[in-house]
Amino acid sequence: MSHDDWPTSELARAWTHRGIDCRVYVADYLDNGYKRPNGYAELPEAHPARHLNLQGDDCGVFDVHGGITFGGDGSRVIGWDTAHYDDNWSGDPNKPGRLWTVDDVEDETTRLADQIADLYTPESIAMFKAATRLRELADELDPTKETHA
């Protein structure tokens, strides 16, 4: 799987919210029979967050349970998972931790889609394009960079 594709696990739900494609995938990550749901959303081509390192330096851009744990840094698909310390990993409702349902993950992923859409404005796109061009110009003018003429 390349870093910018949708996951290859079992698709549980797909929808579009405010123009953002969203999906919930499930997989038995621990081979214990419990298929844990995780949420994913697609960043539009010109979205300013598409080129950020969402799992590193720019991890605070989106507020989602556990942070962005899939994609980022040029990826078209970003996602989050339900495998954190305060989550129920067993699938047993009698065990401690939050046991996420597909409906719960859909709600949290829809909240992520709202954040993506809120950042996808004409102003933010124009600023991103201007910043990209400034970086390109700086690279062209940098005397320490080798040119291939």
Which positions does each model-derived feature cover?
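Structured loops at beta-to-helix junctions and adjacent beta-edge loops in soluble globular domains
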Residues: 25-27, 42-44, 81-83
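Generic secondary-structure transition motif, activating predominantly at the C-termini of alpha-helices
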Residues: 113, 117-120, 135, 142-145
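Polybasic, proline/glycine-rich intrinsically disordered low-complexity segments
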Residues: 2, 8-23, 50-126
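Short intrinsically disordered terminal tails
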Residues: 1-2, 139-149
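Acidic (Asp/Glu-rich) sequence patches and key acidic residues
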Residues: 33-48
